[in-house]
From Swiss-Prot:
Zn(2+) binds at C145, C148, C158, C161. Transmembrane segments: none annotated. PANTHER family: METHIONINE--TRNA LIGASE, METHIONINE--TRNA LIGASE, CYTOPLASMIC. Residues 579-681 form the tRNA-binding domain. It is found in: Cytoplasm. Homodimer. GO terms for biological process: methionyl-tRNA aminoacylation. Gene3D superfamilies: HUPs (3.40.50.620), Isoleucyl-tRNA Synthetase, Domain 1 (1.10.730.10), Methionyl-tRNA synthetase, Zn-domain (2.20.28.20), Nucleic acid-binding proteins (2.40.50.140). A motif ('HIGH' region) lies at residues 14-24. This is Methionine--tRNA ligase. Belongs to the class-I aminoacyl-tRNA synthetase family. MetG type 1 subfamily. One of its GO terms (cellular component) is cytosol. Pfam families: Anticodon_3, tRNA-synt_1g, tRNA_bind. The lineage of its organism: Bacteria, Pseudomonadati, Pseudomonadota, Gammaproteobacteria, Pseudomonadales. It comes from Pseudomonas putida (strain W619).
Length: 681
């Protein structure tokens, strides 16, 4: 038998500035299932995480709430820890980046990089808020877009037209913190010489450490040449001061990944059998895996391995990247009630429902995962209650009534037993590859076979016949053994259901190797219902509660008269009819919709308006993260708008949408029956 593997696993650090939502939970559930599988197989697998507790946003929120940053992050950590525990995410340690371990390790890694010549210094010019006495990050500057003149836009990009620009290009800039007009000032900053590691990163990113799609994306950065990375921020800033540089602080993204090491070091101090150096030294034989979302790939697959290499430490075995979560085919929306906090979900539904649904839909790629709430109800009820738990509930009563709860010996269906044994390696392989969806499909296929076999044997009918009691007991004992096999396979996903099943089965905690054995002449405990169906009304109540969360956050129970959309966005000045008539509005069919490479907000739409097609760029990507879902839909467009040349091509019109922007954008559609090219009047 091979030696148990030594594995250290991390999930991305949640920011200590807000609540956990179901989009976050996708990653932690994915990681937890993989860790539980490794432990079930007998491997030493350590799972650590921490709150990401530094940065200007935390400093400013604490100031707004009238508490210290330390108090804020302690409050948030308590909330996060409770949410994770109740979702059955079983960290070996959940720490904080605001810790002595992280301070020491950040200083150590920085000092090694500096001494090796990988740190540069130079002056940079930035906007400075004279009232707050602080330099402003791009997102803390607002003004008028230099391209389309839209007001109240951020300092790095326009949410209306999708343009990107430098903060110094913004017209009429204002501090989003104080409202003051910022001034330009120079400051010395510290830079990590990422280009020093170009060759290493080109090799490492193609060495099997990343999914192909991720490696291909990073190749674009590598091929265009890496840039030095600004790793410093000026006081006031909540974080760690750079050694020997008063008033200069590490940028949050320098010490955040080091927080993985710090959390593990904190754990090592409490578990003497763990050796920190054995996991982090350059020649470490242990495995190291990071689970992250695709929005932070650059930090984990370029900056982080380069920092580790420069500091003489080991690099990750692999970085496993997942996509975003959508709900009902669209980006999570506060107004629609689909921006669901972890606690709001837990107030209404069992955590294992969502764990199973995520598992059933998670592949090993980076595609987005859609939580379709109607499908969620149907799938959980059908698979877990209707298939898996149904086997135990069908068989247990006959064993208790007919044989005092004792399972008879013998194998009533050798071909089924063999099929379950033969499926185990493939299921294990799918778990190992993080292809949870394939694992669930194979497990449910086995459940279908077991249910079909029991239905064919119909022990409920045999029990009514004279002299058939031995056959009934053999059938039901086989059914319980098959149920036990399924619970072993599902244990990484459904730990509470597995524990309840173990109590019913009257067995010690199941391990993966237990699938090779059977229960014979074995006494069962009385059967209790193991899982109830999801009631659609509870999902509806969760959505309603999520909308109430939004209202509470905005400090309002209901939107009073005079505080509706017109109050937020007053009517424009009156125009003459002829002015309106000059605008040619047409029905348009969206033939093709796709993201624009290099543009965070834009989608490129190909529109059919009857006798011709138009190319239109629209800043609606934030509300429609899966643009393919727009294809085949009718919308409305301004057809006689003068074509406008943009950085990505020529836009030949404008589609009509409502909403304040960001994720709250709603593309307008005509009633059914309208045809492409018809005038809107």
């Amino acid at each position: 038998m091979s030696e148990p593997r030594q594995i250290l696993v991390t999930s991305a650090l949640p920011y200590a500035n807000g609540s956990i939502h179901l989009g976050h939970m996708l990653e932690y559930i994915q990681t937890d299932m993989w860790v539980r599988f490794q432990k079930l197989r007998g491997n030493q697998c350590i799972y650590v995480c921490a709150d990401d507790a530094h940065g200007s946003a935390i400093m400013l929120r604490a100031e707004k709430e009238g508490i210290t940053p330390e108090q804020l992050i302690a409050n948030v950590q308590a909330e996060h820890s409770s949410d994770f525990a109740d979702f059955l995410v079983d960290f070996d340690n959940f720490h904080s980046t605001h810790s002595e371990e992280n301070r020491e390790l950040s200083s150590l890694i920085y000092s090694r990089l500096r001494d090796a010549g990988h740190i540069a210094t130079r002056s940079v010019t930035q906007y400075f808020d004279p009232e707050k006495g602080m330099f402003l990050a791009d997102r803390f500057i607002k003004g008028t877009c230099p391209k389309c003149a839209a007001e109240d836009q951020y300092g790095d990009n326009c949410e209306k037209c999708g343009a990107t620009y430098a903060p110094t290009e913004l017209k009429n800039p204002k501090s989003a913190i104080s409202g003051a007009t910022p001034v330009l000032r120079d400051s010395q900053h510290f830079f990590f010489k990422l280009p020093d590691f170009q060759a290493m990163l080109q090799q490492w990113t193609r060495s099997g450490t990343l999914q192909d799609a991720v490696a291909n994306k990073l190749a674009e950065w590598l091929d265009s040449g890496l840039q030095e990375w600004d790793i410093s921020r000026d006081a006031p800033y909540f974080g760690f001061e750079i050694p020997g540089e008063p008033g200069k602080y590490f940028y949050v993204w320098l010490d955040a990944p080091i927080g993985y090491m710090a959390s593990f070091k904190n754990l090592c101090a409490r578990r003497p059998e763990l050796d920190f150096d054995a996991f982090w030294n350059k020649d470490s034989k242990a495995e190291l895996y990071h689970f992250i979302g695709k929005d932070i790939v650059n930090f984990h697959a370029l900056f982080w391995p380069a920092m580790l290499e420069g500091a003489g430490l080991r690099k990750p075995t692999a970085v496993n990247v997942h996509g975003y979560l959508t709900v009902n085919g669209a980006k999570m929306s506060k107004s629609r009630g689909t921006f669901i906090k972890a606690r709001t979900y837990l107030d209404h539904l069992q955590p294992e429902y969502l764990r199973y649904y995520y598992a059933a839909k998670l592949g090993r790629g980076v595609d987005d995962l859609d939580l379709n709430l109607e499908d969620f109800v149907q799938k959980v009820n059908s698979d877990l209650v209707g298939k898996v738990v149904n086997i135990a509930s069908r068989c247990a009563g006959f064993i208790h009534k007919g044989n005092d709860g004792v399972m008879v010996a013998g194998d009533a269906a050798p071909e089924l037993t063999e099929a379950f044994l033969a499926a185990a390696p493939g299921i294990a392989e799918a778990y190992e590859a993080r292809d949870f969806g394939r694992a669930m499909r194979e497990i449910m296929a086995l459940a279908d076979r077991a249910n079909a076999w029991i239905a064919d044997k119909a022990p409920w009918s045999l029990a009514k016949q004279e002299g058939k009691q031995d056959e009934v007991q053999a059938i039901c004992a086989q059914g319980i053994n098959l149920f036990r096999q399924l619970m072993i396979f599902l244990k990484p996903v459904l730990p509470v259901l597995a524990a309840d099943a173990e109590a019913f089965l009257n067995v010690a905690p199941l391990t993966w190797s237990d699938h090779l054995s059977r229960l014979e002449n074995h006494k069962l405990n009385p059967f209790k219902p193991l899982m109830s169906r999801i009631e659609p009304a509870r999902v509806e109540a969760m959505i309603a509660a999520s909308k109430e969360d939004l209202l509470a956050a905005e400090g309002q129970a209901q939107a009073p008269v005079g505080n509706g959309e017109l109050a937020k966005d007053p009517l424009s000045a009156e125009i003459e009819f002829d002015t309106f008539a000059a605008v040619d509005l047409r029905v348009a069919l969206i033939v093709k919709a796709e993201a624009v490479p290099g543009a965070d907000k834009l989608l490129q739409l190909t529109l059919d308006i009857g006798d011709e097609q138009r190319n239109v760029f629209s800043g609606i990507k934030s509300a429609y993260p899966d643009p393919s879902r727009l294809e085949g839909r009718l919308t409305m467009m301004v057809a006689n708008l003068k074509p406008r040349k943009m950085r990505f091509g020529v836009s030949e019109g404008m589609v009509m949408a409502a909403g304040p922007g960001g994720e709250e954008i709603y593309l307008l559609s005509p009633d059914s029956g309208a045809k492409p090219g018809q005038r809107i009047k």
